[in-house]
Amino acid sequence: MPNNPSLKQDKITGVLYKHPFSVTAFLVLVVLIATGMQLKSGAAACVVQVCGYLLIIGYGIYLKQTKRLTPEALIVLIFAMGFVLRLGYVLYTDIATRQNDAGIFEEGNYNYFHSGYILYIRDHLALPAGDVSKMGEYYHPPFHHIVCAAFLKIYELFLPKGTHNYESLQALSLLWANFSVIVLYKDIKLIGINRESCPIVAALISAAPICTILSGSINNDNLSVLLMFTAIYFGLKWFKEGGIRNIVLSALATGFGMMTKLAVGLIAFSLGFLFIVKLIKDIRGRKEGLRTFLNLVVFGVICAPLGLWFEIRNYLNYKVPVTYVLLSDNIYQDVSRYTPAQRLFGFYGFPIEDYYINLGSDGQQDYNIFITLIKTGLFGEENCRDDFLMSITGYILLLIFLVVIAVAAAGMIYTVLTLKKRDSFWEDISMVIMCVTQIISLTMFAFKYPHICSIHFRFTMMLALCGAVFFARISGIKLKGSNKDLITKITGVIAAAFFILAIIFYTILWTYVKGEVTVVDVTW
């Protein structure tokens, strides 16, 4: 949207634009107090969503009529729609639905899933003792579980004695997911995109299906994503502005992120590149170079102990490898019989016939790494094939997402070819490094652990950042002549279509009732 000096600033959207974190936290707290993060029916949650959408759209029309729909106001409204979407999703999705390795919450049952991990820490105020390689999900670093345990401990002070509401944990999930979207947008802005592309990027990320799925998830993925984006943000700020505060905050976010999920450390490739570039630039000036070097020492001193103490503890006590990952024993998901060529290039009816995940129990397996990544990025592990409405909506959403991916891929090529034309030269290179290292890491992990569950978009959220930046690069292209904004308009339509279809899909998902699941004998 071009800058129009005749537009006036709206006070409400102005406050929301300046204080998104505090407003979001307040709203989540209100929802927690009012609902306990659960409603009696999916229909009630849908009513909340639809009323929220209508209110936001109505307010947007009012701002348009009164000439106060500034680009900033439009972005606020877009993010508000995303908040309402995720709120409704959480209210109709309980902690036993669309979860990954969560297990069942039951008092005194310290199962080897995330639920048992959280309850153990809550009840014992200590970490579980023992060889984590024999304790299921307990191999994960404990920061997320400590936060959840502390939250339950405090929240239960306000409940009648002896009662529990584990659904309340989704208040944290909802908070982390909304914060992640906000920080992701701030990352993209800090890297540098033009003003016209900002609402387009906001539409791409605010209703992103993977963020909606994570908003109801109680495992450690959500918090790790937030801390990863936060580490990138303050790392970028330090690269641009310097300052001990920025490097300390980046180190804390990286350290706590790795203490949530070790894979957060993968950002070291892209951030490390920027840190080295800054050191080389600043070393020309003796004092400035020394200051930058000491800043990096501070980063390492903070980040390394926070991020690695748990893995080192397990190695010293039980010889558990630092990069240990729990192996799946689900034979239905075993795809080791497929060749590397099949796993990279095999296309089996996708996207025409087969656009929901195949986990093997019905005799069909998703063995292609990138097809599985796309499916989980849109639908998680949900399968709505037996519902006509969900199938049609999901299929259209998939087709639009493929267009988004194509534009982002073209944007990466364009970014590389036009690096010297932008002030964000080094930042753009770091995005390319981030994208390449994420894809290589994903591929290596998939080959090392050849199970369908080893591939999920929630493991590759850095691609959301890279993809949005590259999409914005295409959106910002100006043509010559009277149609100079044509590409911006086309990419805007694509982003708007993705935004609308994602909202529709995850607004009506509550209506889906899973049919009888057919489980076949393994034939491979």
Regions found by a protein language model. Name each.
Residues 74-82, 252-253, 286-311, 330-336, ...:
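Hydrophobic alpha-helical membrane-interfacial segments at the cytosolic entry of transmembrane helices
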Residues 210-224:
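Short acidic/glycine- and proline-prone juxtamembrane loop motifs at membrane-interface regions
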Residues 293-408, 509-510:
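Membrane-lumen/periplasm interface segments of specific transmembrane helices
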